[in-house]
Design a protein with these regions (language model features):
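A short alpha-helical cap/connector motif
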Residues: 1-171, 175-246
């Protein structure tokens, strides 16, 4: 306790990230290295995530098409390293508006919110189609910040009613299927600010018919994408051109 009060605690080691660049240009290329600091309030976030995982398997939403299907919170959560990256992006970019879909159990939302609290500005809009998962996510994110709105419903159905301004950072992490993600991206890109950052989780999802690797490659190859990098073999990040118009 005395060491904490005197500011003598050891600095926490940075998270090391494995990067694979597809387009090494733009803001991402200038600022993103293979190392980011640990997120603010990380011990609390990971403690909440562990408590959530102890709830055991939770039923999937009907939209996933798996009758009787379940997932454990640990399987669908963002990794702690990616969480550090999310908080770092927020602190570096100072976004006014972050959007994520789906929220799952709120781990990514907690990391985004930790970055917003550290920055002292901005708002997270989170969407989750599973009402039971949404309740847990809302409670978890609320343990970090009040700078968020959690909407029960699909992004593509509700975004026009909920998010009024341009989106600066977006996390796409809902149903992992090529056509579904592409339809969501078509809606999302019209609302992104110039130079905005889009994160695509689970690009390594290889269930038959998912084609998530193909989604990532097609989006990264677009001419209006300034930078594109793969993180930990799982997360794709694209930086939209600063000259594009919303």
């Amino acid at each position: 306790m005395l060491r904490r009060l005197l500011g003598l605690t050891r600095p926490q080691p940075n998270s090391q990230l494995r990067l694979a660049w597809l387009k090494k240009r733009g803001w991402l290329a200038a600022h993103l290295t293979g190392s980011v600091p640990q997120a603010p309030r990380k011990p609390h976030i990971e403690s909440v995530a562990a408590a959530t995982d102890s709830l055991g398997p939770q039923a999937l939403a009907a939209e996933y098409g798996e009758v009787g299907g379940t997932r454990t919170p640990a399987v669908v959560r963002s990794s702690s390293r990616c969480g550090d990256l999310y908080a770092w992006l927020v602190q570096q970019r100072s976004p006014a508006t972050i959007v994520e879909f789906g929220a799952a159990f709120g781990v990514s939302g907690m990391y985004f919110s930790a970055g917003l609290e550290a920055s002292g500005a901005g708002h997270l809009y989170s969407f989750e189609i599973n009402p039971e998962w949404a309740e847990i996510a809302e409670r978890n994110i609320g343990s970090i910040s009040t700078r968020f709105t959690l909407t029960r419903g699909a992004f593509e159905d509700r975004v026009a009613d909920v998010v009024k301004g341009p989106i600066d950072i977006a996390l796409v992490d809902a149903i992992h299927q090529y056509d579904f993600v592409m339809r969501q991206f078509t809606i999302l890109e019209r609302r992104m600010s110039p130079g905005g950052i889009v994160l695509l989780d689970d690009i390594d999802f290889d269930r038959p018919g998912a084609r998530m690797r193909e989604v990532w490659q097609d989006l990264a190859g677009r001419p209006d994408v300034a930078g594109a990098v793969e993180v930990q073999g799982r997360l794709g990040i694209i930086e939209l051109s600063a000259s594009r118009r919303t």
